[in-house]
């Protein structure tokens, strides 16, 4: 696998030199300063590429080109936004970048309730607490009909949770959920946030699916012409939240999407942490069935808690993800590609990492501190080397 690292640009506290020292050779990056929907010009793309290559690294994957909300809802100026997206893809391809990760999650890119969850060893991780999230929906946001999404027991626990929160805790939980995270442009007040949710009140899973398929069918001629691979990121968490539909959460979703849009440039990002939150997602089988569609992979693990909808980010080789067999199957897919003449390695990045050691004293992007990802990359690299020597170099 190609060892890559997500970098948030010149303002990222983790420098390109740090990334080189971690052993990564590829950079995963996006032009986050350009508003959603606007065209990424060649001048801006080449300027960023020059910075990356100036540190003897390669811009391997774009993560991500955000999809405008009006494309997802297929309302307003969606046709204009699609044309802009096409031009951005053309510009990226003509600048030598051939893989783009994106997502089709309504409103929020990814959601956690705690960005500083303390682990037993004193490091910090990201966490999603189902009861805290219920307290937010039911008693802070007060989303209409939110009670329909929670059991009576969860509603009771959420009320107790909320009643014991201070004003500061309410503000922090709210900020964690709706204030926006690294790589995302949007941040909302409660009122603005509810207004965004309301845009989807008449959009169910089938409608959102069809909007995604429509969008991809518009892009495929360009992708096929330029050899540019799209790799959709799964929903995080992989189930409906906030009354919003989700369309990339299970193998059934992948089956549907690849049937509706069969072109090979329509691919997936295998994010083991996102898919792995669901106990009914067999990650190894997903790779076996759709390995030829995997153009990018995020390797991390999560640990489901007593409430199976709650989880926290585990160590890369721990938690619920069978990382041994996941990496084994990815290496088998690379071997299949090599035999067919495709020598391009699958770009892999150690997704997220615990905040630990000296990084505990620093301001870092949630999930994207240097040392935790350095540890994760080293562990996955060691696993890959061991598997290759034992099974693939004979």
From Swiss-Prot:
Gene3D superfamilies xref list: Divalent-metal-dependent TIM barrel enzymes
Stored InterPro entries: Man_deHydtase, Xyl_isomerase-like_sf
Pfam families documented for this protein: UxuA
Cofactor (UniProt): Fe(2+); Mn(2+)
A biological process term (GO) from this entry: D-glucuronate catabolic process
Pathway membership: Carbohydrate metabolism; pentose and glucuronate interconversion
Enzymatic reactions: D-mannonate = 2-dehydro-3-deoxy-D-gluconate + H2O
UniProt key word ATP-binding: no
Positions in coiled-coil regions: none
EC number(s) recorded for this UniProt protein: 4.2.1.8
Domain of life: Bacteria
Single annotated GO MF: manganese ion binding
Keywords assigned: Iron, Lyase, Manganese
Record-stated family: Belongs to the mannonate dehydratase family.
Free-text function comment from the UniProt entry: Catalyzes the dehydration of D-mannonate.
Protein name: Mannonate dehydratase
Native source organism of the sequence: Psychromonas ingrahamii (strain DSM 17664 / CCUG 51855 / 37)
């Amino acid at each position: 696998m190609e060892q890559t690292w997500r970098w948030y640009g010149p303002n990222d506290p983790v420098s390109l030199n740090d990334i080189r020292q971690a052993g990564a050779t590829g950079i995963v990056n996006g032009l986050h300063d350009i508003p959603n929907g606007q065209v990424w010009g060649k001048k801006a793309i080449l300027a960023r590429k020059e910075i990356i290559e100036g540190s003897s690294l390669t811009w391997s994957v774009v993560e991500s080109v955000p999809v405008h909300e009006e494309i997802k809802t297929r309302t307003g100026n969606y046709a204009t936004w699609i044309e802009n997206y096409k031009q951005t893809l053309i510009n990226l391809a003509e600048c030598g970048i051939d893989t783009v990760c994106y997502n089709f999650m309504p409103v929020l890119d990814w959601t956690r309730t705690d960005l500083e969850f303390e682990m037993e060893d004193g490091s910090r991780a990201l966490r999603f607490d189902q009861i805290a999230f219920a307290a937010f929906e039911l008693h802070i946001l007060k989303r209409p009909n939110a009670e329909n999404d929670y059991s009576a027991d969860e509603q009771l626990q959420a009320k107790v949770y909320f009643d014991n929160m201070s004003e500061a805790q309410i503000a922090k939980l709210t900020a964690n959920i709706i204030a926006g995270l690294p790589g995302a442009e949007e941040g909302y007040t409660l009122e603005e946030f509810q207004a965004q949710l309301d845009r989807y009140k008449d959009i169910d899973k089938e409608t959102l699916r069809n909007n995604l398929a429509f969008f991809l069918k518009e892009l495929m001629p360009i992708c096929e012409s330029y050899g540019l691979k799209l790799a959709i990121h799964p929903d995080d968490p992989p189930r409906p939240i906030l009354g919003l539909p989700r369309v990339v959460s299970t193998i059934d979703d992948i089956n549907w999407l690849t049937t509706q849009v069969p072109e090979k440039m329509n691919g997936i990002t295998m994010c083991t942490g996102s898919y792995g939150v669901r106990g009914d997602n067999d990650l190894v089988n997903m790779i076996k069935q759709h390995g030829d569609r995997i153009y990018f992979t995020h390797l991390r693990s999560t640990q489901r808690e007593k409430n199976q909808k709650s989880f926290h980010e585990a160590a890369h080789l721990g938690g619920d993800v069978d990382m041994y067999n996941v990496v084994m199957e990815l290496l088998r897919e690379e071997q299949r590609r090599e035999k067919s003449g495709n020598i391009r390695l699958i770009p892999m990045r150690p997704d997220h990492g615990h905040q630990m050691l000296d990084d505990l004293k620093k301001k870092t992007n949630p999930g994207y501190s240097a040392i935790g990802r350095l540890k994760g990359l080293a562990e996955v690299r060691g696993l890959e080397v061991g598997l290759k020597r034992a099974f693939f170099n004979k």
